[in-house]
Design a protein with these regions (language model features):
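N-terminal periplasmic accessory domains that precede
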Residues: 83-86, 108-114, 123-128, 142-148, ...
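Structural signature of Gram-negative outer-membrane beta-barrels, strongest in the C-terminal barrel
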Residues: 254, 263-264, 361-377, 409-538, ...
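C-terminal beta-signal and adjacent terminal beta-strands/loops
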Residues: 4, 582, 635-641, 670-720
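Membrane-embedded beta-barrel scaffold of Gram-negative outer-membrane proteins
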Residues: 209, 305-310, 314-332, 478, ...
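Gram-negative outer-membrane beta-barrel transporters
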Residues: 191, 356-364, 369, 431, ...
Length: 720
């Protein structure tokens, strides 16, 4: 939980940074360009270097794989209040509502192309290029997702052709949350949003603050704050409190060299209302029968980045240190009794990533060769505790019961990654071969304790070493300045996690997959479109299943994920002047993710939809902006892990098919302009027609989880 000392520290830091920012206002001016003109022999061609920097639609057009950028304006106009809302806008990405042990706004459950969504383990998730998971190798789950929406400028989702530069756990692509940049002149903005739910009588507020600027000497500073506070739509035990503060600094050393630093602190706590049995859901889908389930976590990280770019050469060094903690309380059910479990865990890691890129010319052929390295060292300390069993009907306060540790573990990983790729431009063609080499050494020392919580009864000392070459080849052809075609093939890899190392008797292996894409990008002032065919062949895939109250990792074996992703946005005013201000868009994704081994061979994997789609329209008239959105998904499966593929709902509400659904949202916004200090306000509604939908979970607090009911929201933004 957030302590008073932490709050006092954050307050003092915020006050100091705000004072420094105000001192910049008087002298702030637009800085001079940070790169020189290209060398004469290169004409307009300049080195790209890190293609995660400054994501734009032009970069998407030049990327030889599926890539989607969701910008801040689109985030605001969809009424998004969480990372989940934004990622639902991306073709191929499916988002599970909060459920199970990922059952609060502090966590993030996303699955790409039919991959498991529970705690987002198979996408490499970054914020400004820095990993956001507890431990990128040993604990990649996002039960704590330390990113708050109000601090973001855009969300960059790279689903293909990224595994050479970024990893591990990249079979589900790379997701980079891009925070707001330090402005060239002094700027500040405060905003707040509030959601009011039609059930539970609850409301949730999302305040944010941004202030920053750059002075004439090239020194820039920015303070960003974003939070979430309030209760959700369940009748009890679903309060959320999130505070996310980021301080960014930058200094332009010369026209070719600059440095950037950041200091980030995130604290979040979320109550988890838990799942319902089939009978409980039928009686009241919004009730909660769990009073103690909760999750809290915090993360502090710092990063430093040096960048040199002269048109032909680009050298970059990124270093970061991350310290995080997470704790949870969850009740376990057994024969009409319960016991309270706790799982405090601490992690920290240090990483350094140098990279060098250089342009070469050979006649009409231009090459950009990039070489990079990453050293990452991480450690973990985990404790598992539990009370004795009790009768929940008569227990007044389970938190007052003695709670005893029964297992401890100390883990760590030392990893070296090397990569090289060569972007070869020949006329309209770009061919990029590359390879990444991962060398990983991991261990997890596990001690099982007796009933007294101190006597060691048994120990395990598993280790794992991995040496993996991950080649990729991508090809892009430019039909013209607005249209490109692409294809790529590569190999992705996921090392064993700490919890998997401890299960030595189950014969678990690192995950590996081969990925293939063919597609196209189109970008013009009137039309923006993308179309991608994809195929993922998993040689090995691990799955977390439940045996009684315990979570067990099993080797699911071979799986195949294939399908088509598409999206289109059209400015109808470019077609007919009478439709000026009207823009419409549509997206559709078909995914087939099936097991190719075991009892469920040929059957759908759990908790993904074969069909997902969106239809939206935007109309701007004067100072008004009107938005309408429709989102739909087909049914999902929750078949269990036994020998029978379950399709009918069980009494616990954990297994059985999940019906598809569609929801409609409307929004109206007004910009007062200079008449009222550029104030922007909006009002909207989500799930307009009160469509009742749900998901399932097989966790200890699993069952049926009702989705968002009709929700009214208001937004206000004031620049100053």
């Amino acid at each position: 939980m957030v302590s008073s000392n932490h709050c006092a520290t954050l307050t003092r830091c915020a006050a100091a940074v705000a004072a420094a920012l105000l001192s910049l206002q008087a002298s702030a001016q637009a800085p001079s360009p940070t790169t020189t003109a290209p060398e004469a022999g290169l004409s307009a061609i300049t080195v790209t270097g890190n293609w995660l920097d400054n994501p734009t639609e032009e970069k998407v057009l030049d990327h030889a794989g599926a890539r989607t950028i969701v910008e801040r304006a689109r985030i605001e106009e969809t009424g998004s209040s969480s990372l989940r809302d934004v990622l639902r806008l991306v073709p191929g990405v499916q988002v599970q509502d909060s459920n199970g042990t990922g059952g609060s706004d502090v966590s993030l459950n996303i699955g790409v192309r039919g991959l498991t969504a529970r705690l987002s383990p198979r996408s490499y998730v970054l914020m400004d290029g820095v990993p956001v998971s507890y431990a990128p190798y040993g604990q990649p789950q996002l039960s704590l997702a330390p990113v708050s929406l109000g601090n973001l400028e855009s969300v960059d989702v790279i689903r293909g052709a990224g595994s050479v530069r970024y990893g591990p756990q990249n079979v589900g692509g790379i997701i980079n949350f891009v925070t707001r940049a330090i402005p060239k002149t002094f700027a500040a903005e405060a905003s707040v949003g509030t959601e009011i739910y039609s059930h539970g009588g609850n409301a949730k507020t999302t305040p944010s603050l941004f202030v920053g600027g750059t002075n004439e000497s090239g020194l820039g500073l920015a303070l960003l704050y974003s939070g979430t506070h309030g209760d959700g739509w369940r009748a009890g035990n679903d309060k959320t409190d999130i505070d996310d503060i980021l301080v960014k600094g930058a200094y332009r050393i010369s026209a070719q060299d600059d440095i950037a630093v950041s200091l980030h602190h995130f604290e979040g706590s979320g109550r988890m209302p838990g799942g319902l049995t089939a009978a409980q859901y039928a009686a009241d889908p919004f009730q909660s029968t769990r009073s103690y389930d909760s999750f809290d976590g915090r993360r502090t990280d710092a990063s430093f980045k040096y960048n040199h770019k002269d048109g032909r050469n680009n050298f970059e060094v990124l270093g970061y240190y991350v310290d995080s903690f997470r704790g949870s309380y969850i009740e376990q059910d057994n024969a009409n009794q319960r016991r309270l479990t706790a799982a405090p865990r601490s992690y920290h890691y240090f990483g350094i990533e140098p990279r060098y890129s250089r342009l070469f010319e050979t006649g009409s052929v231009v090459q950009e060769v990039s070489v990079g390295y990453r050293y990452l060292k991480e450690s973990s300390s985990e404790v598992a505790l539990r009370t004795a069993y009790y009768n929940p009907a008569t227990m007044a306060n389970a938190m007052a019961l003695p709670i005893t540790p029964y297992q401890t573990s100390q883990g760590g990983t030392t990893a070296h990654a090397f990569y090289i790729d060569d972007r070869i431009d020949i006329g309209n063609w770009t061919i990029t071969p590359g390879v990444r080499y991962e060398r990983i050494n991991s261990f997890n020392n596990v001690s099982n304790l007796g009933a007294d919580g101190s006597t060691v009864t048994s120990q395990l000392f598993p280790k794992a070493d991995a040496r993996e070459f991950l080649p990729t080849l991508s090809v892009l052809y430019r039909m013209n300045a607005q249209w490109s075609l692409f294809a790529n093939a590569g190999k992705s890899f996921g090392p064993q996690q700490y919890a998997q190392l401890a299960q030595t008797e189950r014969g678990l292996h690192p995950e590996s997959a081969k990925t293939y894409e063919v597609g196209t990008h189109y970008n013009s002032p009137a039309l923006n479109a993308e179309l991608t065919l994809f195929n993922i062949d998993f040689d090995k895939e691990l799955l977390l299943t439940r045996v009684g109250v315990d979570g067990i990792w099993t080797d699911l074996g071979a799986t195949r994920h294939r399908g088509i992703e598409s999206s289109l946005r059209y400015d109808l005013g470019q077609w007919n002047a009478a439709l000026k201000g009207l823009t419409a868009g549509v997206s559709y994704t078909y995914t087939e993710a099936v097991s190719r081994a075991g009892d469920f061979a040929g059957r759908d994997l759990p908790l993904y939809s074969r069909h997902t789609g969106q239809l939206w329209a935007r109309y701007a008239l004067g100072q008004w902006t009107l938005n309408a959105d429709l989102a739909a998904q087909s049914k999902q499966r929750s078949p269990g892990s036994g020998t029978q593929y379950v399709t009918q709902e069980d009494a616990a509400g954990q297994l059985g098919d999940i019906p598809g659904f569609a929801t409609v949202g409307l929004r109206a916004g007004y910009d007062f302009g200079k008449s009222l200090s550029n104030l922007r306000v909006a009002v909207g509604v989500k799930n307009l027609f009160e469509r009742r939908y749900y998901t399932r979970s097989t966790d200890n607090n699993g069952g049926k989880y009702v989705g968002m009911p009709r929700t009214l929201y208001v937004q206000g933004t004031l620049p100053f």
